[in-house]
Regions:
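Hot-dog-fold acyl-thioester-processing enzymes
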Residues: 43-63, 77
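HotDog/MaoC-like acyl-thioester-processing domains
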Residues: 102-147
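Hydrophobic beta-strand-centered segment that forms part of the acyl-chain substrate-binding groove
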Residues: 67-104
Length: 147
């Protein structure tokens, strides 16, 4: 899949119902970085008036996989395999996260996959509140191999 179609898919993902309903918006900065934010609304507020944990997780779900798919190209299989979220403090207002994979890490993963091996890299991201406090820490485990 060429770059145009990947970028179009990334723009259209903002209209995917679970993301749209939670008010999650993404913005691609470059090939290896995506900024995501979510405003607190009646649709993503929990019973105590802060961000619902499921929405915080949904905010972090697809991005590392999408970055890795774009970085490696169509000759590789990339799947989300597992995730873990640790809630650190209540989220009020708009929360944000920056998903980034360094080019050196992409090169390391590609080298392992090119040897015919599967690789299961782990990535982490913090979700930040408006005052700069950490709201949640998320770890994602991917599965990567050459087709």
């Amino acid at each position: 899949m060429n770059s145009f179609w990947l970028r179009l898919r990334e723009r259209l993902i903002n209209f995917y119902p679970p993301l749209l309903g939670a008010g999650i918006r993404s913005r691609t900065i470059d090939d290896l970085t995506i900024h995501v934010e979510m405003k607190l609304t009646a649709l993503n507020r929990n019973i105590v008036g802060v961000h619902f944990g499921g929405s915080l997780y949904a905010m972090c779900d697809p991005w590392f996989m999408l970055i890795m798919m774009r970085a490696l190209g169509p000759d590789y299989i990339v799947w989300d395999k597992a995730a873990r979220i640790k809630f650190v403090s209540p989220g009020h207002g708009t929360v944000k996260a920056v998903f980034q994979i360094p080019q050196e890490r992409v090169n390391e993963i590609r080298a392992v996959a090119d040897r015919g091996e599967k690789i299961e890299p782990t990535f982490s991201v913090d979700v930040w509140g408006e005052q700069g406090q950490v709201i949640a820490h998320v770890e994602k485990l991917l599965y990567v191999r050459k087709k």
